[in-house]
Amino acid sequence: MTKIMFFGTRDYEKEMALNWGKKNNVEVTTSKELLSSATVDQLKDYDGVTTMQFGKLENDVYPKLESYGIKQIAQRTAGFDMYDLDLAKKHNIVISNVPSYSPETIAEYSVSIALQLVRRFPDIERRVQAHDFTWQAEIMSKPVKNMTVAIIGTGRIGAATAKIYAGFGATITAYDAYPNKDLDFLTYKDSVKEAIKDADIISLHVPANKESYHLFDKTMFDHVKKGAILVNAARGAVINTPDLIDAVNDGTLLGAAIDTYENEAAYFTNDWTNKDIDDKTLLELIEHERILVTPHIAFFSDEAVQNLVEGGLNAALSVINTGTCETRLN
């Protein structure tokens, strides 16, 4: 019987993974550990592996997988910047991802957290906790229908986000290297700077790559409309975090919502209750009154989790049986 290791198992995923194994006549072993130099030897007797990495995979894992006859790694996220695709290819390892698992879920999250900032929820909550129930200009907002929203990246998630904002009646500008002709209700601009210059809300939906690394830094923030709101439910490396904090502090941004952080791997998805966090930048984000931080959780719905579990396992089995899969990256 074919054997697949399901690394990075959350409690709520275990039953889904085992049920998939029964339906597909595959022996699935679940483990809460991640694939790494320390765990790769567990795969000696396996045919395939799926995992949910957050940090960079060590280079010595690829040749070890090859030596064990394993031909793939099925990543259970859309992002894949934790892998060296060229090195994997050199060792005959197919890397795959799950590019679409519930774009609407992430879009809904992106809009809902933006609305918290639009309607000044953090400020209102602090006032109420202090028993200040007055109405003041500082917590007055304006309707989204009178706003311009910039969507940076109009793939599946960005497109879904744009459609929600369109339902509010917002004016929508966008930038994408490959414009979506079906999104005829928005206006594409020739650059990110052009797309954001008049935007009240900026919503990021781009992958992590060389072109997007620290795309939003001090130089980019200099082109932002004063008082804009920035939402990042894409990848942490898209933002230069210290520059973001400066932009909020100096009033360039009214606020920001951050679901991804470039140094999140050690912290996000882990319980750090009653532990010391050494990352001073992360602490500054968390403690900032006008920055909302969530732990890479925008995708987290029952539909998305089911699709990620099955998407990873389906890709692993496809490579085992045919040598490739539809979501292959290298």
Swiss-Prot record:
Organism classification: Bacteria, Bacillati, Bacillota, Bacilli, Bacillales
Pfam families with a match to the protein in the record: 2-Hacid_dh, 2-Hacid_dh_C
Keyword field: NAD, Oxidoreductase
Family of the protein in this entry: Belongs to the D-isomer specific 2-hydroxyacid dehydrogenase family.
Catalytic activity: (R)-lactate + NAD(+) = pyruvate + NADH + H(+)
One MF annotation (Gene Ontology) recorded for this entry: NAD binding
Binding site for NAD(+): R156, I157, D176, V206, P207, A233, A234, R235, D259
Catalytic activity, EC: 1.1.1.28
Top-rank EC class of the record's enzyme: oxidoreductase
Superkingdom per UniProt: Bacteria
Gene3D superfamilies, per the entry: NAD(P)-binding Rossmann-like Domain
This protein's record includes keyword NAD: yes
Active-site residues annotated for this sequence: R235, E264, H296 (proton donor)
Keyword flag rRNA processing: no
Protein name per UniProt: D-lactate dehydrogenase
